[in-house]
A protein has these predicted regions:
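Acidic, metal-coordinating helix/loop segments flanking the phosphotransfer/catalytic sites
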Residues: 48-66
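C-terminal output helix
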Residues: 124-134
Length: 159
């Protein structure tokens, strides 16, 4: 018997037909651009939060298959949010992508060391964002832990 993953479909965490992506960004214009880009694939239900605290609340309610996070937001920044999610066993393995205008290598390292799976910069290409979503949804917990350890070792070696 064939299963959906043989045809490139990735099962979601809840068993629904559509995978759910939570976008957390305080800029409504950017949120609309991200929603448009993600909806180009037609495979995702997109839900939104406009700051880190609201985003944290929505994660527990919505149980998304992937979370896209901005860094600079009111009430809780993206790095704090990522650390909070990685510190909670209920959200430890939720795929996280930072999408930020902060482009320095140090910003990216802070993101990865906070536990995000992918760090993309604005402006972004819809194809790159969609590829990142597909990639992080496929990561296993062991893949995620191995990547964080490698990044931490590489970062420590440069200090």
């Amino acid at each position: 018997m064939l299963n959906n993953t043989q045809f490139g479909e990735i099962p979601n965490r809840r068993g629904d037909a559509m995978k759910k992506v939570l976008v957390i960004d305080d800029n409504p214009t950017i949120v609309e651009l991200i929603k448009y880009a993600v909806n180009l694939q037609g495979r995702y239900d997109v839900v939104v939060a406009y700051d880190g605290v609201e985003g944290l609340e929505r994660i527990y309610v919505e149980q998304p298959d992937c979370v896209i996070i901005d860094v600079k937001m009111p009430r809780m920044d993206g790095y704090q949010l990522a650390r909070c999610l990685r510190g909670d066993p209920r959200t430890l393995n939720v795929p996280l992508i930072i999408l930020s205008a902060m482009t320095r290598e140090q910003d990216q390292m802070t993101g990865y060391l906070s536990g995000v799976d992918e760090y993309l910069t604005k402006p972004f290409k819809p194809s790159a964002l969609n590829a990142a979503i597909e990639r992080v949804i496929l990561l296993t917990p062991a893949d995620r832990q191995r990547r964080i350890e490698q990044l931490a070792q590489g970062h420590a070696g440069r200090e």
